[in-house]
């Protein structure tokens, strides 16, 4: 954190497709005056910094450069996108062992630098890695946020906007739970222009089967994109920019994220997708969405799935480190 008033610094760890898309989105929006890129492939970070600085005359002044973990010491926000990418046919949970190991090598030098800002985690499986970031860093839960279901919620709003012929910005609907195969659409509390979505669907002859198909298409959209172009990055890069903006501008914005559960939804000691208030302190509070009985079960089942994978992954990492 600089001595200059209103000077904000962000460090990006992981300069792959998601990281570089996030960096570009931040440059486009003119958010943060100082932006540092860290990656094991140093030459790429130098190239991206040089490329991105050429955008600044068209957007806003910004110091963009290739850096090291030591640059985290005075950062306001550290964004972690580093990790092995999801391959065709591979679920996000399949990535857990590889990416827990990578994460463990990142967090120590970041924390050792003296960093005391906010962590925003986007590497997959994001709910698992967000929990691990909180656990390994020793940071307060409010200062560790996951991108969670931000992208899934955007996908749901896009699909519903198309179905009901409204702007996705006008759709107030959330995907909840794991960022992955056990996620679900919270249709019971969804609205368009304050009117319940289920009521609109009934009036317009949209069946529950059609809504289930939309939910399924959202759940599988990442796999569709990966099969066609190898990876997803523009959507999640923009979602990360939006969360970063809420933090750095102290917005108190209600956003879909991965948040620590402390009794909400009857869940404890887990990070999972939910609406939450995001501001300059990080995660201000969780907003517990009202759920139908069926949705409550889906939330519980999603948490059970995550907890099993989390426990197995952390145990495997501990065994590896003990050898």
From Swiss-Prot:
A molecular function GO annotation: L-lactate dehydrogenase activity
Localization per record: Cytoplasm
GO biological process terms on file: glycolytic process; lactate metabolic process
Enzyme Commission number, as recorded: 1.1.1.27
Superkingdom to which the source organism belongs: Bacteria
Residue(s) carrying Phosphotyrosine: 223
Pathway: Fermentation; pyruvate fermentation to lactate; (S)-lactate from pyruvate: step 1/1
Record-annotated active site: 179
GO cellular component: cytoplasm
Ligand binding (NAD(+)): 18, 39, 44, 69, 83-84, 105, 122-124, 147
Keyword S-adenosyl-L-methionine: no
Keyword terms, alphabetized: Cytoplasm, NAD, Oxidoreductase, Phosphoprotein
SUPFAM superfamilies in the cross-refs: LDH C-terminal domain-like, NAD(P)-binding Rossmann-fold domains
Subunit composition and interactions: Homotetramer.
Family of this protein: Belongs to the LDH/MDH superfamily. LDH family.
Record protein name field: L-lactate dehydrogenase
Gene name of the record: ldh
């Amino acid at each position: 954190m600089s001595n200059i008033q209103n000077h904000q610094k962000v460090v990006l760890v992981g300069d792959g497709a998601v990281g570089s898309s996030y960096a570009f989105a931040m440059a486009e929006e003119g958010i943060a005056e100082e932006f540092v890129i860290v990656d094991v492939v140093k030459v790429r970070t130098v190239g991206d910094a040089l490329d991105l600085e050429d955008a600044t005359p068209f957007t806003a002044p910004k110091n963009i450069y290739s850096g090291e973990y030591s640059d985290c010491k005075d950062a306001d926000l550290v964004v972690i996108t580093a990790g092995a990418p999801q391959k065709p046919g591979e679920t996000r949970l399949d990535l857990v062992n590889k990416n827990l190991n990578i994460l463990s090598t990142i967090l120590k030098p970041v924390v050792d630098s003296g960093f005391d800002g906010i962590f925003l985690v986007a590497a997959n499986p994001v709910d698992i890695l967000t929990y691990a970031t909180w656990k390994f860093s020793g940071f307060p839960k409010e200062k560790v946020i996951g991108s969670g279901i931000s992208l899934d919620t955007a996908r749901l709003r896009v699909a519903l906007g198309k179905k009901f012929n409204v702007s996705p910005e006008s759709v107030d609907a959330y995907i909840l739970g794991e960022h992955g195969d056990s996620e679900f659409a919270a249709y019971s509390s969804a609205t368009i222009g304050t009117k319940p979505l289920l009521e609109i669907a009934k009036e317009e002859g949209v069946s529950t089967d059609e809504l289930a198909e939309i939910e399924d298409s959202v759940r599988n959209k990442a796999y569709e994109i990966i099969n066609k172009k190898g990876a997803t990055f523009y959507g999640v890069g923009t979602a990360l920019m939006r969360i970063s903006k809420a933090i750095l501008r102290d917005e108190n914005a209600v956003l879909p994220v991965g948040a620590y559960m402390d009794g909400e939804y009857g869940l404890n000691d887990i990070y999972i997708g939910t609406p939450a208030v995001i501001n300059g302190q990080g995660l201000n509070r969780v907003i517990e969405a009202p759920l139908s009985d069926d949705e409550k079960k889906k939330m519980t089942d999603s948490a059970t799935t995550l907890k099993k994978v989390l426990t197995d992954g952390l145990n495997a990492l501990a065994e590896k480190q003990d050898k």
